[in-house]
Amino acid sequence: IPDPEKIGTLGKMFRFFYSYLIYTSTTKLLATMGTRPDEMPPGSRHLWPFKTFIANTFGRSRFIKTQIIPLVFNAIFDKNHFSVLFDKYHPDAVFLPHMLGWFDNLLLREAKNRGVKTIGMAANWDHIDKYFIPLQADLLLAQNELIKSAAIRDQAYRENRIRLTGYPHFDFIWDKKYLMERSDFLASTHVRLPSGAKYFLYISGSVYCPDEPDVIEEVLNWISAGRFGPDVYMVIRPYLGGRFKDRDFDDNKFAGFAKHPKVRMASRESWKAVEDTIPLLNFMAHAS
């Protein structure tokens, strides 16, 4: 799959254009301030007037969003990157769990060109109203009413092509059968704390919050001074992240706290499997 940063000048210009066919409050934040100190807004923050112009002119046309953009996308990005897989498996349908992602964009293109039905989903709550997505799935799974409304308003979906699903993972979070007794959890290898201990759970924001060590250090000073009572600790869960540099950033950021007597580091399990999520569920449930 080609790197989206290596698709040529024409491809980059087209991606820039269709991305700003919407300009919501989220888009404005990304276009003017950015959300990461290590990355500038696409094209620089000074282009925000041009980005709003695209949204307020071309972005008002449903025809451009649903007809012209897919046509041009198909013409510019014309390589069949998934042809081997489709020829081998002949799928009846394709599920796209990350509609905003470049990988899913190209997979969706291949499926549409072959007449294969597609089901799409936003991988995160802000993916539908952040940038315009160039291709539509035949059926979009929306986790809540806000995502459904954004898909209709910003992504030009018809209501009859959207299904509300809720967040199935929330059912797991609320299921008491996965909760351990507090004393057992504190004694487990995940925590190793005294049975009567209390702890703050600090969930990292990674490069989005580069000054977190200052906050943690101040709280640890309060803990050491006894401001919260005896046997109080801090559990730090590093940002899960999707980028290796985010993980490296967190590893370096929290390295100085790993050996602090009042700190426990939560392991960085993903949410991909139930057994990997159980420790985090218990960390949240038993935090003081």
PLM regions: where:
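Active-site donor-binding segments of glycosyltransferases and PAPS-dependent sulfotransferases
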Residues: 1-25, 247, 255-258, 262-271, ...
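Conserved catalytic-core segment of nucleotide-activated headgroup transferases in glycan assembly
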Residues: 170-270
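Structural alpha-helical scaffold elements that stabilize or flank donor/cofactor-binding regions
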Residues: 85-87, 133, 193, 274-277, ...
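Conserved N-terminal ligand/cofactor-binding loop architecture of enzyme catalytic domains
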Residues: 1-82, 88
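Active-site-proximal region of nucleotide-activated glycan assembly enzymes
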Residues: 69-73, 77-80, 89-93, 97, ...
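A donor-sugar binding/catalytic signature common to diverse glycosyltransferases
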Residues: 120, 142, 274-288
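Conserved acidic residues
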Residues: 90-92, 138, 198, 279-282, ...
